[in-house]
Swiss-Prot record:
GO biological process: endoplasmic reticulum to Golgi vesicle-mediated transport; Golgi organization; intra-Golgi vesicle-mediated transport; intracellular protein transport
Disordered: annotated segments: 53-84, 874-914
Locations listed in the record: Golgi apparatus membrane
Chaperone found in the keyword field: no
Disulphide bridges: none
Name recorded for this polypeptide: Conserved oligomeric Golgi complex subunit 3
Main location group: Golgi
Domain of life from the UniProt record: Eukaryota
Residue ranges, compositional bias (Low complexity): 53-64, 884-897
Keywords: Golgi apparatus, Membrane, Protein transport, Transport
């Protein structure tokens, strides 16, 4: 047990010793803390020990170990440890190590101080060198001070010499500049004699370079003297230089005029040619060579001299006057040459186009256009700058054209000729030629505008006379009023010309191709039938009423020839007279045939009129101003009543009130031609609808009117005698013998017979006159609605006036659905005649063996049964609308405003306004 306890105590002691040894180098609280330098040395020793190994011989030198961490703390010396060696006998214990460590540490410290000792020696050496250098610098500074004093003395002497030299040089330069300025100024005064001598020299040529230099010197000297008028004798020398300039201008004027005169003489009197100017006019090339060849040759001589003057126009007014004189002389010479030639040429053109005013105008104006262009081109071969005198000269040439054409224009009576001349002047001349070359044709444009205004004035005057004579005072012949015979004749001619050729199938095997071809041919027949339904043959050939055709032709002529305000006034008058003429013709046709024919005639031509004036892009509204004197009468009557206040001094002076209240008022009225056409069309449509309803259900309308008057009389009687009001008093209609069920039944049967008999005639007339399905439908719709409303009104009267069920059965009054079916069946019967054309065309088409071809042909050719079904279906929706619109108003009161508003511009009139 003692041994065990002893062992445990020893182990406990060893554990404590180990713990204490571990606490020597504890990171948190070490018992023996080492410095950084000591830790570094220990690391070095550890590395050396690790590298040497336990079997390292005693006398060997360990391998040099590099420090692992080169970034030591500041101030720690970095020394090589190559020469540090362990003791020969090695390190046996801790004491040996500590002794060896003390020696090594002392040696290391000594080695570290050696560097500082060496550096101290170097500093002491540098200090000695600096002391020696300071001594030498002090000696050099003493010498530099002496040298600076000497330099300052020399600098002062040199500066004084330079100042004196500069003053002398400045004075010399001033004197030299003064001398040069005097010479320069005297130069402008000393040139006058030299210039006079040169200008008086007989050998001086205007086209030479010496003459150019003379002009340059004259301009230069004259400009200088004018800029310095205060110089001595400046006015005298100004006069002298003006004289020199006048001499030079005279030389230029004489030279240019002589060259131009020679060209004029050679043109008017050619020496080496046997032909004169009149014979030369027959050939254009010869005429151009005669009238422009000599001048083009002279232009080369004159151009160089003229350029001398043109470049100096801004220097002096003398040059401007000289240039004006030269241009005037040139234009005068050209006028003497060209005026007779132009006059003779226009006379020849007038003779060649005698009686043809349009060709005369076109040829004469075209000739003047070429003359103006050639004259401007020739003018700019002489002169570079334009001149207003050229325009005056060309206007003189163009005046010959004006004087020649105006006598013809003021005697032309045909509107077509005047309109054609307007087009020639406005479009061909002004818009085409003048706009392409406005500068050369400015004078021609002025004369052409004057001619155009004269033609327009004559055109307006003749248009007024034409409207009065051929439209207002037009007396139609029997052929003009032959309606509907004329339309029927044109329709029969059109049907005979539209007979299609039969189709043949080339091969029975190509059944598919033949079926497709049959479908295409069927479509073409259907399209031709549709076109036939939309276009009246009379409209296609322009066979309108003469006044309508003349009005539209007149307006189309005036539209492109006169200004918009003038056209608006003329169109207002023309449309007004045309409407009156159509209304007059419609009345005569209605008196000769039937009112329906007259009204359809008027509707047809009013629609044509409205369609044809639509392309005119102009406002047909005209403003008229008038004076309203209505207040003058009232004011005068008030003045007579207030005679005692005529001279009253107060505010109620009668005379002042008369002057203030009796002033006539200016009123402006806007007249719209298009609205006038629509207003007349509305009136005619109302009349036509009323007459058509009376024609179809006249007995029923008469009965309803009579019934209304009877019921109104009974109502007034009942209101005057209240005691007589009994339930039977309201059955006065039933008690009337003419309103018995039998009489009403006969009226209804007669009305139905009239519908069946006359509806086809009515629709045939509408198709013949209007030839437009949409227009026919729009006009026929209120007729149909009025008929249905009349029967609905009759049914309401019978129901509310004591008629029993038996009476209703006796009367056999049809319902709205029955009336609609009746009208539809009658419409189908009326359409049979129209559909005969398509049926005949369909029969001529060869049937195909394929089912597809037959089906396609069946789809394209509509039969009468299909039409009936379509009509029944289309009328079903209209019945409800008719019932809702049914009212006790008279049958003839239809909303014709909607009819006119819905009327489309008919496509039947294909002839354009042109």
């Amino acid at each position: 047990m003692d041994d065990v306890a002893t062992a445990q105590s020893e182990n406990e002691n060893l554990r404590k010793i180990r713990n204490r040894l571990m606490q020597w180098e504890s990171k948190t609280d070490p018992l023996a803390a080492l410095s950084v330098q000591q830790e570094e040395h220990l690391d070095v020793f550890a590395n050396l020990w690790r590298d040497s190994g336990p079997t390292l011989p005693v006398g060997t030198t360990p391998t040099t170990a590099e420090p692992s961490d080169e970034a030591n703390t500041e101030g720690a010396p970095t020394k090589s440890t190559d020469d540090i060696e362990l003791p020969a006998e090695g390190l046996q214990n801790t004491n040996d190590f500590l002794l060896w460590f003390v020696d090594v540490n002392a040696e290391i410290e000594q080695r570290g101080d050696a560097v500082y000792h060496k550096y101290l020696q170097q500093l002491e050496q540098r200090k000695a060198e600096c002391s020696h250098m300071l001594g030498q610098i002090s000696v050099a500074m003493d010498r530099l001070g002496a040298l600076s004093d000497e330099y300052e003395f020399v600098s002062q002497k040199t500066s004084a010499l330079n100042t004196a030299s500069e003053q002398l040089i400045d004075e010399q330069e001033k004197l030299q500049d003064l001398s040069n300025e005097i010479q320069r100024r005297l130069h402008y005064f000393s040139q006058v004699e030299l210039l006079n001598q040169r200008l008086q020299s007989p050998t001086l040529s205007v086209a030479s370079e010496a003459f150019r230099e003379c002009l340059n010197k004259i301009d230069e000297c004259l400009n200088y003297i004018e800029e310095n008028p205060k110089f001595k004798d400046a006015a005298t020398y100004n006069v002298k230089y003006r004289q020199c300039l006048a001499k030079a201008s005279g030389l230029v004027r004489n030279y240019v005029t002589s060259v131009i005169n020679q060209a004029t003489e050679a043109t008017l009197h050619p020496k080496n040619s046997a032909t004169d100017s009149s014979s030369a006019l027959q050939a254009p090339d010869a005429a151009f060579a005669l009238y422009y060849g000599k001048y083009q040759t002279a232009a080369a001589k004159v151009k160089r001299v003229v350029q001398l003057i043109e470049t100096r126009l801004e220097h002096s007014n003398d040059y401007t006057q000289l240039m004006t004189d030269l241009q005037q002389h040139y234009l005068a010479q050209r006028a003497s040459v060209m005026s007779p030639a132009v006059n003779l040429s226009i006379q020849n053109v007038k003779t060649a186009h005698k009686g043809d005013h349009c060709s005369l105008t076109r040829s004469a104006c075209g000739f003047l256009v070429h003359v103006c262009q050639d004259e401007q081109r020739l003018f700019y071969q002489f002169f570079s700058t334009g001149a207003p005198h050229l325009t005056v000269y060309l206007e003189g040439l163009c005046t010959i054209l004006y004087d020649t054409l105006r006598p013809f224009i003021i005697h032309i009576n045909h509107l077509e000729t005047l309109a054609e001349i307007c087009s020639i002047l406005r479009i061909e001349m002004l818009e085409e030629h003048v706009q392409q070359n406005p500068s050369a044709l400015e004078a021609f444009a002025t004369i052409a505008h004057q001619l155009l205004q004269d033609v327009q004035e004559r055109l307006v005057f003749r248009a007024h006379l034409y409207l009065q004579s051929d439209i207002q005072n037009f007396n139609p012949s029997s052929g003009d009023l032959a309606y509907p015979e004329k339309l029927e004749m044109m329709e029969s001619i059109a049907l005979s010309l539209q007979e299609p050729t039969p189709l043949r199938r080339s091969d029975s095997r190509a059944s598919v191709i033949s079926s497709v071809s049959s479908v295409l041919e069927t479509e073409s027949v259907d399209n031709s039938y549709r076109i036939k339904q939309m276009n009246s043959p009379a409209d296609l050939h322009g066979m309108w009423y003469p006044t309508v055709r003349r009005t539209l032709v007149c307006l189309s002529r005036l539209y492109r020839c006169v200004d918009r305000p003038i056209f608006q006034g003329l169109s207002q008058e023309a449309l007004k007279l045309c409407i009156q003429s159509v209304s007059y013709a419609g009345g005569k046709i209605g008196a000769a045939k039937t009112p329906i024919d007259g009204e359809l005639f008027e509707i047809k031509h009013l629609l044509i009129l409205r369609e044809q004036i639509a392309p005119f892009r102009v406002d047909f509204t005209v403003k008229e101003t008038s004076l309203d004197f209505s207040k003058v009468k009232t004011a005068a009557f008030g003045l007579l009543q207030k005679r005692k206040q005529l001279f009253s001094m107060g505010s109620n002076n009668a005379l002042l009130e008369f002057l203030l209240e009796g002033t006539p008022q200016i009123k402006e009225h806007l007249l719209d031609s298009r609205k006038e056409v629509d207003r007349q069309l509305k009136t005619v449509c109302e009349k036509y609808i009323r007459d058509a309803v009376n024609m179809l259900i006249g007995p029923l309308i008469t009965f309803l009117d009579k019934t209304q008057s009877l019921l109104a009389q009974a109502a007034s009687t009942t209101a005057s005698t209240p005691e007589s009001s009994s339930p039977k008093a309201s059955y006065v209609l039933r008690q009337s013998p003419w309103a018995s069920p039998q009489q009403i039944s006969s009226i209804i049967q007669e009305t139905q017979r009239m519908i069946k008999a006359k509806l086809a005639v009515l629709q045939r007339a509408m198709q013949l006159y209007l030839s437009n399905r949409d227009t026919e439908f729009i006009i026929f719709r209120p007729i149909r609605n009025n008929i249905i409303q009349s029967f609905v009104k009759l049914e309401q009267l019978l129901t509310t006036n004591g008629y029993s069920t038996d009476d209703m059965i006796i009367t056999s009054c049809p319902s709205a659905e029955q009336v609609s079916i009746l009208l539809s069946s009658a419409s189908i019967l009326a359409a049979e005649g129209v559909a005969s054309f398509a049926a005949a065309a369909a029969r001529k088409i060869s049937t195909s063996s394929s089912i597809e071809g037959a089906a396609a042909g069946g789809r394209k050719l509509s039969t009468m049964s299909n039409k009936a079904e379509l009509l029944r279906e289309s009328k079903a929706e209209e019945l409800e609308a008719v019932r809702s619109e049914a009212a006790p108003a008279p049958a003839e009161s239809t909303p014709s405003e909607n009819v006119v508003a819905e009327l489309e511009v008919p496509t039947s009139a294909q002839a354009s306004s042109e």
